[in-house]
């Protein structure tokens, strides 16, 4: 006769151990060793000892959380933001900026198997010129939440301040909250974006139901009183301009217009320095033909055109190609052309590529540029600058160039997002003669 037993829940006792942290990974986690295994502990810094509880134990590594910190690193800082540790935006406000830059540079050097030549950085606070804040109506309290997502969660942290935002945007937070919280449609708001352009401040409101005339009037009054350009987005395809003209920002002596939803680099200071250094590394000469792949609306393309004989910008998004052409006209640049192409196909067969290029710049998305590396090699440029927002795909794509006879001449860590785990970089490849 079969006997049945009630299942017993498997219990695991979290092991408490004492560790010494000897490194910081690029995500801001302390790194220690225990029983021959690497242990990652958020919140700890090198030279700190702590009692920690193991939360995840894998074959090659383990994760733990701090139970009690026993000592403090000389590079520990008091976080400026009251939401740090709960908000998912920043991971490293407890570490000095110098330590953050060293740990990211070390991670980049390991991946690229090459020393980092320099760190390109700007101000570590008040650098973000764009932010998207989630909105959520709470029926019980009839209040509107406005903020960023919690780390590893879809819950919203109700943000009152954010010291990495441009000061103009941070100062707007309580005013925007009060305005949106007074709308009849606050149950039907998705998110609000704030953008600080050279031309002024933008507010883009995503709403999921039609706005009443009273709500529209409130928003218009608010935009006028705060000097904002106001845009309404009833869905992902439609953008209604309520007030303001085409926004623009300055970049290396040029004026670049953009649509409120277009991608622009969040850190204006690092962007300026990055573009200037890219031009310097390419050593652009008056007779050069230069190719800019994944060119967007011309962030690199147009500055390149001020120095080269001709520049071709290639982009996969038609609207950005159109914006690049418009920006070339606005800046009086007649030696630059933009093309919409599928960059997974062989662009070297296009008529505009028949004369080849002396220099190439590429700035792909996180997926990298595996599909175009062989095309670049076929063009035989003397110098290549690769701008990357993902060091793993950069390392992968670099292998093709190294095998084709190029060498890494310069490697820079771009501190585009201080206090976060984001690591951006730029590499100069030179062809071996």
UniProtKB/Swiss-Prot annotation:
Keywords for this protein: 4Fe-4S, Iron, Iron-sulfur, Metal-binding, Methyltransferase, rRNA processing, S-adenosyl-L-methionine, Transferase
Catalytic activity: uridine(1939) in 23S rRNA + S-adenosyl-L-methionine = 5-methyluridine(1939) in 23S rRNA + S-adenosyl-L-homocysteine + H(+)
Pfam families named among the record's database cross-references: TRAM, tRNA_U5-meth_tr
Enzyme class: transferase
Entry EC number(s): 2.1.1.190
InterPro entries: 23S_rRNA_MeTrfase_RlmD, MeTrfase_TrmA_AS, MeTrfase_TrmA_CS, NA-bd_OB-fold, SAM-dependent_MTases_sf, TRAM_dom, U5_MeTrfase_fam
Residue ranges of domain TRAM in the record: 10-68
Signal sequence, renumbered to the chain: none
GO biological process: rRNA base methylation
PROSITE patterns: SAM_MT_RNA_M5U, TRAM, TRMA_1, TRMA_2
GO molecular function: 4 iron, 4 sulfur cluster binding; iron ion binding; RNA binding; rRNA (uridine-C5-)-methyltransferase activity
Active site per UniProt: 389 (nucleophile)
Binding site for S-adenosyl-L-methionine: 265, 294, 299, 315, 342, 363
Binding site for [4Fe-4S] cluster: 81, 87, 90, 162
HAMAP family: 23SrRNA_methyltr_RlmD
Function, in words: Catalyzes the formation of 5-methyl-uridine at position 1939 (m5U1939) in 23S rRNA.
Family: Belongs to the class I-like SAM-binding methyltransferase superfamily. RNA M5U methyltransferase family. RlmD subfamily.
Name of the protein in its database record: 23S rRNA (uracil(1939)-C(5))-methyltransferase RlmD
Gene that produces this protein: rlmD
């Amino acid at each position: 006769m079969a006997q049945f037993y009630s299942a017993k829940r498997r219990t695991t006792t979290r092991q408490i151990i004492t560790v010494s942290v000897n490194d910081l990974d690029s995500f801001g986690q302390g790194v220690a060793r225990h029983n021959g295994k690497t242990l990652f502990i958020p919140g700890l810094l090198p030279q700190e000892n702590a009692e920690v509880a193991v939360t995840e134990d894998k074959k090659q590594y383990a994760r733990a959380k701090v139970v009690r910190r026993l000592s403090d690193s000389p590079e520990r800082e008091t976080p400026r933001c009251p939401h740090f540790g709960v908000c998912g935006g920043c991971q490293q406000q407890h570490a000095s900026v110098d330590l953050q830059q060293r740990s990211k540079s070390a991670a980049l050097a390991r991946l690229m198997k090459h020393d980092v030549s320099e760190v390109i950085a700007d101000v570590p606070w008040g650098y973000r010129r764009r932010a998207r804040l989630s909105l959520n109506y709470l029926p019980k309290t009839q209040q509107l939440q406005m903020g960023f997502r919690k780390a590893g969660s879809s819950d919203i942290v109700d943000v009152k301040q954010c010291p990495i935002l441009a000061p103009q945007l941070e100062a707007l937070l309580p005013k925007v909250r009060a305005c949106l919280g007074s709308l009849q449609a606050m149950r039907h708001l998705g998110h609000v974006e704030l953008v600080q352009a050279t031309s002024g401040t933008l507010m883009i409101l995503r709403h999921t139901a039609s706005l009443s005339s009273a709500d529209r009037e409130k928003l218009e009054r608010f935009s006028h009183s705060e000097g904002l350009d106001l845009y309404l987005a009833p869905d992902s395809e439609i953008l209604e301009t309520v007030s303001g003209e085409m926004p623009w920002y300055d970049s290396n002596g040029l004026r670049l217009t953009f649509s409120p939803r277009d991608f622009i680099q969040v850190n204006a200071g690092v962007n300026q320095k990055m573009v200037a250094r890219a031009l310097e590394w390419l050593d652009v000469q008056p007779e050069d033909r230069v190719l800019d792949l994944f060119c967007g609306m011309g962030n690199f393309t147009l500055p390149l055109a001020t120095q080269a004989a001709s520049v071709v910008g290639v982009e996969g998004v038609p609207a950005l190609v159109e914006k690049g052409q418009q920006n070339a006209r606005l800046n009086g640049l007649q030696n630059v052309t933009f093309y919409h192409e599928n960059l997974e196909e062989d662009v070297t067969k296009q008529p505009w590529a028949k004369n080849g290029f002396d220099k190439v710049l590429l700035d792909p998305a996180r997926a990298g540029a595996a599909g175009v590396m062989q095309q670049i090699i076929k063009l035989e440029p003397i110098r290549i600058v690769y701008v990357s927002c993902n060091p793993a795909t950069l390392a992968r794509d670099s292998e093709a160039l190294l095998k084709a006879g190029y060498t890494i001449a310069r490697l820079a860590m771009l501190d585009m997002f201080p206090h976060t785990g984001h690591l951006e970089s730029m590499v100069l490849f030179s062809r071996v003669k």
